């Protein structure tokens, strides 16, 4: 989702970002149901920007209440992940990296060619949101993904991206 730009503040962490050590290649970061090309210019080596709602930076006190729960990508959330809700545009929030762990990604474990092909289909679908060809690409992705089963959104213990994004938000 997106909020109007005048209601947001842009922060650029650059090389100080926790994402920097895993930012070796261009265009590797992903989130769910968004065109990855948009994120490629925002989250890349040496840049790493976040767009947050202006309101929390204009108040005297913020109450951030922890809720102890598990999260598929971040593990335990406590109060750290609460700040994800301050986001002004989801394209600024990397949730995983493309590819399996054997290829330097963290979308899934190991090297799984059918999952990689399914990821390509998801990327193609996300470039066609709102068009009739979207459903064709999503169906192809689902069929390919069934070969190995599981998920294509980095929902496993080896996700090394989400915790870094959450920690960056808490450092702003």
Annotated model-derived regions:
Residues 1-172:
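Extended, low-polarity segments enriched in aliphatic/aromatic residues
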């Amino acid at each position: 989702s997106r909020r109007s730009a005048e209601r947001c503040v842009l922060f650029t962490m650059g090389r100080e970002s926790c994402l920097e050590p895993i930012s070796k290649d261009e265009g590797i970061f992903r989130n769910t149901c968004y065109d990855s090309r948009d994120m490629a210019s925002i989250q890349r080596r040496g840049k790493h920007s976040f767009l947050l709602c202006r309101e929390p930076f204009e108040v005297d006190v913020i109450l951030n209440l922890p809720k102890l729960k598990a999260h598929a990508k971040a593990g335990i959330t406590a109060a750290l992940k609460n700040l994800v809700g301050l986001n002004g545009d989801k394209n600024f929030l990397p949730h995983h990296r493309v590819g399996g762990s054997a290829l330097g990604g963290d979308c899934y474990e190991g090297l799984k060619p059918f999952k990689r092909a399914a990821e390509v289909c998801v990327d193609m679908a996300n470039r066609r949101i709102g068009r009739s060809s979207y459903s064709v690409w999503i169906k192809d992705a689902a069929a390919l993904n069934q070969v190995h089963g599981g998920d294509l959104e980095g929902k496993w213990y080896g996700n090394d991206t989400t915790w870094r994004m959450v920690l960056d938000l808490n450092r702003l």
